Amino acid sequence: MVSFGGLARKIFGSSNDRRVKTLRQRAEQITALEKNYENLTDEQLQAKTAEFRAALAEGKSLDSLLPDAFATAREAAKRVLGMRPFDVQLIGGMVLHERGIAEMRTGEGKTLMATLPVYLNALEGKGVHVVTVNDYLATRDAETMGRLYNFLGLTVGVIKHGLDDDERRAAYACDITYGTNNELGFDYLRDNMKYERAQMVQRPHNYAIVDEVDSILIDEARTPLIISGPLEDRSDFYNLIDTFIPPLAEEDYEVDEKQKTAIFTEVGTEKVEKLLEAAGHLKGESLYDIENVAVVHHLNNALRAHKLFQRDKDYIVRNDEIVIIDEFTGRMMPGRRYSEGLHQALEAKEHVTIQPENQTLASITFQNYFRMYNKLSGMTGTAATEAEEFGNIYGLEVLEIPTNLPVQRIDEDDEVYRTVEEKYRAIVRDIRASHEKGQPILVGTTSIEKSEQLAERLRREGIKGFQVLNARYHEQEAYIIAQAGVPGAVTIATNMAGRGTDIQLGGNLEMRVRQELSDVPEGPEREEKIAAIKADIAQLKEKALAAGGLYVLATERHESRRIDNQLRGRSGRQGDPGRSKFFLSLQDDLMRIFGSDRMDGMLQKLGLKEDEAIVHPWINKALEKAQKKVEARNFEIRKNLLKYDDVMNDQRKVIFEQRLEMMDEEDLTETVAEMRHEVIEDMVILRIPKDAYAEKWDIAGLKQDIASKLNLDLPVEEWAKEEGIAEEEFENRIKEAADKAAAEKAERFGPQIMTYVEKSVIMQSLDNLWREHLVNLDHLRSVVGFRGYAQRDPLNEYKTEAFELFQTMLANLREVVISQLMRVEIVGEAPPEPQLPPMAGLHIDGTTGENDFDEAIWAEHQHDDRIVPPAQRDPADPRTWGKVSRNEPCPCGSGKKYKHCHGAFE
């Protein structure tokens, strides 16, 4: 029976079809201009940029310039890159310009498509950011597409790990800036820890195109970017808490594998309360008293470490360290640590050295970072399954872009086996059969561990010449994945590895030229060798096509349909044939968690024998249903997290805006006077409550407050004896005395020095209190969920208490600032420049989950991001230097710039 909605779609087309139809008409208008642009000389084509900018200056809109700007960029691409954007790429480019997400199949040319809206929007001169998932892709795309932009008179910069502030500032000042989501986010956080606007590197956030948008805005949405600094060593406390968990019985806690939670039952809570009391760590009467917030937090972490995290699945122990394994890619992530004490709980569990916990100095989620852009768009091969989330959270509409040629890939039904062993035997048989007939095979696994297990099986079976993709550097990874289309190639890779690099049947010309001819200079010999490589690739492509094209063989389903679709999408690019198939077992995680017991019983009744598979569309539908459930749950988690993060985000905006205002202020006299008066008002109302009798006044306390907060000795006892004096008179007299003392100090210092001192004190105090506030919010967040048991809404409780904490922080700020300013005196030497605290930022690759810092250096020198004052550096010991700017004199005293001295060895 056909539903009414289905019938309507057949007659009128889906909303996606109708939108594509409208955009196709506009693409045809651009194509109609092609002949005119082909007739222009290079100089005339290049002059178009100035012409468009002049039109914008006269008030024309970007939309009105779109047809001509796209036609210009298309013609320039033909001349400079030898590539002509198809009409479907024009359609995708329009979607990106109109704040949408273009879902474009793998191999259809997303990178080239992006040049069209990038060129158009860069004409405004406000900056366009093209965001990729790793440094390799950012550099590659900036170099390749930079030729096109430079030809058209636009400047291009690239942000990558290892650049100093001057280099970053120059890259952000360009018309177009390529960079990773991590680098852009960290630069924003670092900028808002600087003390002068001139030190900042980023411009206002204008327009961003996010490549692999699903990976960045969905997969990484739960992981905030964090800049942190070390706290004191608390390893004894972690070890003590860890001893409480192993003796617990099953009735002491509840574990929900689906929800990934572990909580103490009432019985368990009583047990750990007694243990804490015996150890002298229980404050108050109950574990859940407010004084025990931090203890509860660490107990919950210890329980999660033991009951939710499995060794060799979620992490491995290597060289006396816990190394996290990424859940999406199965990759090890050296250098990355869980925050909020969870990593220390795992270290205590495995009895390795407990590293000091880090304090959050600044943090932001990708959700809130990218929502700062005036205009945001994205592109990916898989977004339709998450269209609702993109719409709800980012206001982005997903549009599926039709392929230039029909997709010929055959997606076969899943094969389901009863055990993992049976499944792997079938996989090896299938790989052997396809390999022997010369068909290239990409084998997708969910973890590095499983990749290695499969590789070992293939070795035992005598299958040789396969590649296992766990390269540490993205460039090597890109080369291996690019050659996965060679006839007979067997490439084992984790699901997301090598994303951003095409698998072309026969091999990748550009990669082979780079690999084989890197030392051959330009000239006839090089051209001859390139022609030979081209001919070889064409021949290999014919063989691969004859064998059926690329075969994507997946060894397990991921809990997200989107990750599965990404893997399938590696095959069948640009109309090539191909096939894909998933091999599953009832012991796989997804099957085990989502009702495989019932299915196992059914298969036994059907009399399924060993090594026999069940293949049926019903199985695919059942799995898809399970995946939809997981996706819906994950969406709810991310949506809920965003609601909590929005509370912090609103406060973050206030603090960062205040810092910017402070940087720009040339005279802070009025601001400081306001703060001083508010401190005095709070002080008086505390000690002399409104309308209270004189006997209730705390005059001794008021005198003490005036001395400690204002550094003044005032005769308040005498004032209190005066007839008819009220709190208002106290206020006015204290304000007058404090204002007079402040004015005298300002006169002694001089306006310039006074403003400098005020600015330094306010900003450093603000930063210190904000960091403490972030820790308080973390602890509040970790325990507020328990309010649900008392029938109170945890989110509302969090909002209320977070606001109270924020108000308290601002009151403390006023007191700290005024107390310091009323005491500060100038000594002979100039006051030191404000220094950033010791800090480190982890830069995690968006696709593979690896740390993009040089791992060896990062492991040995975790303090490299510290800003160390020159006076504290030992010329003979580079470990004391911290972060040194490339153009700074080398701290060793040689007189050379750092980059030409010790920096040359990095």
Swiss-Prot record:
**How does this chain assemble?**
Monomer and homodimer. Part of the essential Sec protein translocation apparatus which comprises SecA, SecYEG and auxiliary proteins SecDF-YajC and YidC.
The subcellular location is:
Cell inner membrane; Cytoplasm
Q: Which residues bind ATP?
A: Q89, G107, E108, G109, K110, T111, D502
**Could you confirm whether the keyword Transferase appears in this record?**
no
Query: What Pfam families does the record tag this protein with?
Result: P-loop_SecA, SEC-C, SecA_DEAD, SecA_PP_bind, SecA_SW
Q: Which cofactor is recorded for it?
A: Zn(2+)
Alphabetical list of NCBIfam families matching this protein: PRK12904.1 (NF009538), secA (TIGR00963)
Family (UniProt): Belongs to the SecA family.
Task: Please name the SUPFAM superfamilies in this protein's record.
Answer: Helical scaffold and wing domains of SecA, P-loop containing nucleoside triphosphate hydrolases, Pre-protein crosslinking domain of SecA
Give any Gene Ontology cellular component.
cytosol
Comment on bound cofactor:
May bind 1 zinc ion per subunit.
Reactions catalysed, as given in the entry: ATP + H2O + cellular proteinSide 1 = ADP + phosphate + cellular proteinSide 2
Enzyme Commission number, as recorded: 7.4.2.8
Quote one Gene Ontology molecular function term. Answer: ATP binding
Which organism is the protein's source?
A: Brucella canis (strain ATCC 23365 / NCTC 10854 / RM-666)
Summarize where Zn(2+) binds, as residue positions. C890, C892, C901, H902
| Keywords per UniProt | ATP-binding, Cell inner membrane, Cell membrane, Cytoplasm, Membrane, Metal-binding, Nucleotide-binding, Protein transport, Translocase, Translocation, Transport, Zinc
Its GO biological process terms?
A: intracellular protein transmembrane transport; protein import; protein targeting; protein transport by the Sec complex
Q: Which residue spans traverse the membrane?
A: none
Provide the topology term for how it sits in the membrane: Peripheral membrane protein
Q: What does this protein do?
A: Part of the Sec protein translocase complex. Interacts with the SecYEG preprotein conducting channel. Has a central role in coupling the hydrolysis of ATP to the transfer of proteins into and across the cell membrane, serving both as a receptor for the preprotein-SecB complex and as an ATP-driven molecular motor driving the stepwise translocation of polypeptide chains across the membrane.
Name of this protein: Protein translocase subunit SecA
